[in-house]
């Protein structure tokens, strides 16, 4: 993990403490190993516009961890438009008892995610290269999460077939999406909203939890 320094480890530990997320030594090691892979592969694969490793800790790792206190929707999860693996990879590390499926239509990104699965030995992680509309899992997911993926309307419409009455949809947003909420499909409702304070991140962060009404 040559690109990852003690400073990054300390920043991760402090931020997790602020978020109230418990990290044992193994989970810290895995998160930092993931960060090292993200730094290495980003040079060729353009996984994220964030280039500074210091920013990656706050804007990717800690941002992903910020939803952990609200991610209580069962053991079978889908990360839609996972990209470089946020928040799916950190969630898979934090919850080894849960099954995490990472879905993305970009082949370069799914190749990277497959490498992460192999190198970090994440047996609970599945990587799927597909468009969300074409993805047909065997059973509904308990939780469906997206981070900077689409509008709430598109998120609901494109993933409706992937969940059921008990599913929670978690949409990670920046500023509060008032206009997007006005366009939310009639068969979805907002179950909860949370303003998130992510250590080291400027600007607003919000998490919206959606449920089906029919």
UniProtKB/Swiss-Prot annotation:
Keywords tagged on the record: Cytoplasm, Methyltransferase, rRNA processing, S-adenosyl-L-methionine, Transferase
Any one cellular-component term (Gene Ontology): cytosol
Pfam (any one): GidB
Keyword S-adenosyl-L-methionine: yes
Annotated binding of S-adenosyl-L-methionine, by residue: 81, 86, 132-133, 147
Family membership: Belongs to the methyltransferase superfamily. RNA methyltransferase RsmG family.
Protein name per Swiss-Prot or TrEMBL: Ribosomal RNA small subunit methyltransferase G
Organism the protein comes from: Pseudomonas paraeruginosa (strain DSM 24068 / PA7) (Pseudomonas aeruginosa (strain PA7))
């Amino acid at each position: 993990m040559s690109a990852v320094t003690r400073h990054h480890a300390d920043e991760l530990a402090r931020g997790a403490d602020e978020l109230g997320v418990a990290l044992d030594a193994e989970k810290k090691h895995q998160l930092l190993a993931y960060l090292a892979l993200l730094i290495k592969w980003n040079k060729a694969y353009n996984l994220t516009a964030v280039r500074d490793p210091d920013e990656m800790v706050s804007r990717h790792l800690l941002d992903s961890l910020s939803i952990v206190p609200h991610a209580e929707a069962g053991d079978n999860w889908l990360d839609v438009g996972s990209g470089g693996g946020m928040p799916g990879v950190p969630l898979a590390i934090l919850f080894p008892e849960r099954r995490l499926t990472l879905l993305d239509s970009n082949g370069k990104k799914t190749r990277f995610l497959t490498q992460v699965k192999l190198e970090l030995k994440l047996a609970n992680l599945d990587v799927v290269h597909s468009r969300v509309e074409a993805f047909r899992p065997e059973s509904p997911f308990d939780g469906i999460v997206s981070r900077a993926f689409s509008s709430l309307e598109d998120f609901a419409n494109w993933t409706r077939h992937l969940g059921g009455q008990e599913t929670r949809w978690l949409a990670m947003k920046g500023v509060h999406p008032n206009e997007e909420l006005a366009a939310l499909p009639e068969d979805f409702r907002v179950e909860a909203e949370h303003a998130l304070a992510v250590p080291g991140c400027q600007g607003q962060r919000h998490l919206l939890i959606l449920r089906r009404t029919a």
